Amino acid sequence: MRVKRWLLAGIALCLLTGMRDPFKPPEDLCRISELSQWRYQGMVGRGERIIGVIKDGQKKWRRVQQNDVLENGWTILQLTPDVLTLGTGTNCEPPQWLWQRQGDTNEAMDSRTTVDADTRRTGGKAAKSDADGG
């Protein structure tokens, strides 16, 4: 009789606590794993109105302001030209996340010479020109 009670109590405890798949990672309610995919690109604004520009994990551009709450529950705590501080939630670890501004640089475009540009425009030959137009 005692074994049946313990077995019944064990089964009831399992049902009440909910079984989870041990091979599945725990659910990320705070979406902390997404933080590394987002980028703070910079800010624009004049006076008191400051708008931050961020890129999310799906490469979608978003405009945010201080104290905005994003759809995943994160809150924009501080917005400066170089840093965006984000609150992830009270029960989340870490409770705050800091992004430093990151701009995209295109090294190939920045290092291209004018001869390369002339070559594309003239159909493959770099045109020589001088002051008299010849």
UniProtKB/Swiss-Prot annotation:
Q: What the protein does?
A: Required for the use of extracellular DNA as a nutrient.
Q: Where is this region: Disordered?
A: 95-134
Name the gene that codes for it.
Answer: hofP
Compositionally biased intervals (Basic and acidic residues)? 109-134
Q: Which InterPro entries match?
A: HofP
The top of its lineage is:
Bacteria, Pseudomonadati, Pseudomonadota, Gammaproteobacteria, Enterobacterales
Q: What happens when the gene is disrupted?
A: Mutants are unable to use DNA as a sole carbon and energy source and show decreased competitive fitness when cocultured with wild-type cells.
**Biological process GO terms, please?**
carbon utilization; DNA catabolic process
Organism, scientific name:
Escherichia coli (strain K12)
Name of the featured protein: DNA utilization protein HofP
